[in-house]
């Protein structure tokens, strides 16, 4: 079974608009042909980003010239996707899969696939790959790369398995996505899960196993079960998001950026990005680079991504807030950037840090120890010289320099670090070390003592009583030891031990999940659709007037222990460094961590040229 007649009539594809028309036609069908669309995108990406030299020894391959916007009078060349080329690649893939999988050996009771069948399909893809190649290289995510080069990255393998299952008529097998990993769901209502690829640098994998153990660990890699369960249209969105326009470290293909942007708008208009927060963030980034007339602005799209995560995924996703923070950082909106980073830390605080979460660790490490210090350094420089951003540059916010005089900015900074410290509590792997402490002290020192003292840190007697118990040897070992890989598949992720006070700033997702406790209660800011607390909301003795500045309720034991140091007139750097790192060092000595592997690096996220 090859391409259908209606599909053939759309070829050849001579331009970006022709490719968009093909996608529109496929999205109009109940089952878009994932194999066809992936081959087309891979073909176009290869000749626009990998091999930009026009070959003269391939007579079937031609390039369509068109006027280039820059420089005026120049030409740009688009690789023509001829029917003969795409049909041959399509036939080769489908023949390879159907020839290797005998469906008669795998009965499908009730019309749903078995774990053995899914494992067999993944074996076919896995065994077809080259034995040795760099798994993190660019442009190896599509079926074009699989057919022509026998190379796929981690997410590409998972997508290839889903595409192969569709080619076999297994309509119940779909892609499942976290923010750094991919696997498949299958069975009645997609209730079953199966690993089909590796994660990180190594080839070690758990193919065929469920993801329940990872969910029970409360690791970010599996999002505590709040991962995306794709339908066919979302799988199309995934392949569009996976387009890599990078020609080299410093140059992107303008044509690929335009193609990706137009395809994402097509999916957006059809409603297929509603449950895809990272795709909305990707689209917002593209709109920031090249706005489309009559379309929502980037800030609106970033907030739509956050709303999607709250509505469908219990507000358990990190990257929607990271996208927003990156936008504000690039535009030097210091207060808004710090607030968004604080929100990312509020999300991560309910996870356990595991070795497979190294990608998000690197994100937080870069933000805390590079991006924020440099942003505050620039703000301090502007404050010293008296320069202020005004009007359109400030986009309605305070000037960058005056951010250091704003106690709410300082409160957001503290909330960010409180979330990181809370993330470490109960985790089998330590997070903080002296490198974090050095830059924390540096960032704290950017704020004058009188500004820091305007932030009121609430400490309730109930919290103090609770804090006395958990740090005994026996209790500490109980807190630190997270579920192991051998957890029973049926075990739900055990909740972290909550603080008695969830804080008046608790945001609540729009889904069925419980309210998320936040460490920050900064007046005038919102999260989860609720007003984040102000001084009037914080309990205080009846005779005391409410404080004027922002109010914080720390969730982590480390930040509770440092509360006096953080708002002191003079920064005691030695005491802060000792307090921030001491318990991490104890944890490293006492806890024997059983690590399944050293998994690292990214997936599903186009590398930015800079924040």
From Swiss-Prot:
Keyword Phosphoprotein set for record: yes
Positions carrying Phosphoserine: 487, 544
Subcellular location: Nucleus
Region entry Interaction with FANCD2, spans: 214-390
Biased composition (Basic and acidic residues): 484-500
Database matches in InterPro entries: Menin (IPR007747)
Pfam family, one: Menin
Swiss-Prot/TrEMBL keywords: Chromatin regulator, DNA-binding, Nucleus, Phosphoprotein, Repressor, Transcription, Transcription regulation
Any GO BP: negative regulation of cell population proliferation
Tissue expression pattern: Widely expressed, with high levels in hippocampus, cerebral cortex, testis and thymus (at protein level). Also expressed at high levels in pancreatic islets, ovary and bone marrow. In the brain, highest expression in hippocampus pyramidal nerve cells (at protein level). In the testis, may be expressed in spermatogonia (at protein level). Low expression, if any, in skeletal muscle.
Modification sites for Phosphothreonine: 595
This protein's GO CC annotations: chromosome, telomeric region; cytoplasm; histone methyltransferase complex; nucleus; transcription repressor complex
Effects seen without this gene: Homozygous mice die in utero at 11.5-12.5 dpc. At 9 months of age, heterozygous mice develop pancreatic islet lesions, from hyperplasia to insulin-producing islet cell tumors, and frequently parathyroid adenomas. Larger, more numerous tumors involving pancreatic islets, parathyroids, thyroid, adrenal cortex and pituitary are seen by 16 months. All tumors show loss of the wild-type allele.
Residue segments, region Disordered: 460-553
One GO MF term: sequence-specific DNA binding
Biological role: Essential component of a MLL/SET1 histone methyltransferase (HMT) complex, a complex that specifically methylates 'Lys-4' of histone H3 (H3K4). Functions as a transcriptional regulator. Binds to the TERT promoter and represses telomerase expression. Plays a role in TGFB1-mediated inhibition of cell-proliferation, possibly regulating SMAD3 transcriptional activity. Represses JUND-mediated transcriptional activation on AP1 sites, as well as that mediated by NFKB subunit RELA. Positively regulates HOXC8 and HOXC6 gene expression.
Quaternary structure and interacting proteins, as annotated: Component of the MLL-HCF complex, at least composed of KMT2A/MLL1, MEN1, ASH2L, RBBP5, DPY30, WDR5, HCFC1 and HCFC2. Component of the menin-associated histone methyltransferase complex, at least composed of KMT2B/MLL4, MEN1, ASH2L, RBBP5, DPY30 and WDR5. Interacts with POLR2B. Interacts with POLR2A phosphorylated at 'Ser-5', but not with the unphosphorylated, nor 'Ser-2' phosphorylated POLR2A forms. Interacts with FANCD2 and DBF4. Interacts with SMAD3, but not with SMAD2, nor SMAD4. Directly interacts with NFKB1, NFKB2 and RELA.
Name of the protein in question: Menin
